Amino acid sequence: MIEYIKGEIAELSPATAVIDCNGLGYAVNISLNTYSAIQGKSSCKLYIYEAIREDAYVLYGFADKQERELFLLLISVSGIGGNTARMILSALSPAELVNVISTENANMLKTVKGIGLKTAQRVIVDLKDKIKTGAMAATAVGGAAGALLPAMNAEVQEEAIAALTMLGFAAAPSQKAVLAILKEEPDAPVEKVIKLALKRL
């Protein structure tokens, strides 16, 4: 079992990272919060969850243990798989997610693509007590996102659309949503654009 992967960042997008460990490249699925935490760094340490299925062996990586713990709690809920959990952790920071669950804010949770009211309520019912008793001080990994310098508009557009298609959205509606957001907020960093797009798609 892999606890963490530490190495140089060979490739990085808002949805995936390739970590080079002594010449071996690990492709890791990441959330937007983790992307914010490691963007601009030459190396990083990601805490790993291994999803082993008959047809695939997938790694999910997190910048800290708290986000991984939240991910594990989310996938323990019936109907929530790895990609849906990652999408929740891309739309909401760890601190926001803990707050949403502890305050039973199902309406906020169902703004995440793919989460209906019933699923949102199930997440809250199943995890409310676990959040309170777990080690959930919830430092928001994505808190530094707002401090990032605005990237080139075209580059932000390209990265955001690529990340959304990696998350399973069709290219055309992704492009439409991203362009609309950048028209409203031309200097928005890619993380913010993706978060806003996740609520519109």
Curated annotation (Swiss-Prot):
Endpoints of the signal sequence: none
Disulfide bonds: none
Region of interest (Flexible linker), residue spans: 143-153
Gene Ontology biological process terms from the UniProt entry: DNA recombination; DNA repair
Segments of this protein annotated with the region Domain II: 64-142
Keywords: Cytoplasm, DNA damage, DNA recombination, DNA repair, DNA-binding
GO cellular component entries: cytoplasm; Holliday junction helicase complex; Holliday junction resolvase complex
Stored Gene3D superfamilies: 5' to 3' exonuclease, C-terminal subdomain, DNA helicase RuvA subunit, C-terminal domain, Nucleic acid-binding proteins
One Pfam family this sequence matches: HHH_5
GO MF terms held by the record: ATP binding; four-way junction DNA binding; four-way junction helicase activity
Region (Domain III): 153-201
Matches recorded under SMART domains: HhH1
Region (Domain I): 1-63
Compartments, as annotated in UniProt: Cytoplasm
Job description of the protein: The RuvA-RuvB-RuvC complex processes Holliday junction (HJ) DNA during genetic recombination and DNA repair, while the RuvA-RuvB complex plays an important role in the rescue of blocked DNA replication forks via replication fork reversal (RFR). RuvA specifically binds to HJ cruciform DNA, conferring on it an open structure. The RuvB hexamer acts as an ATP-dependent pump, pulling dsDNA into and through the RuvAB complex. HJ branch migration allows RuvC to scan DNA until it finds its consensus sequence, where it cleaves and resolves the cruciform DNA.
Family: Belongs to the RuvA family.
Comment text on domains: Has three domains with a flexible linker between the domains II and III and assumes an 'L' shape. Domain III is highly mobile and contacts RuvB.
Subunit structure: Homotetramer. Forms an RuvA(8)-RuvB(12)-Holliday junction (HJ) complex. HJ DNA is sandwiched between 2 RuvA tetramers; dsDNA enters through RuvA and exits via RuvB. An RuvB hexamer assembles on each DNA strand where it exits the tetramer. Each RuvB hexamer is contacted by two RuvA subunits (via domain III) on 2 adjacent RuvB subunits; this complex drives branch migration. In the full resolvosome a probable DNA-RuvA(4)-RuvB(12)-RuvC(2) complex forms which resolves the HJ.
Protein name: Holliday junction branch migration complex subunit RuvA
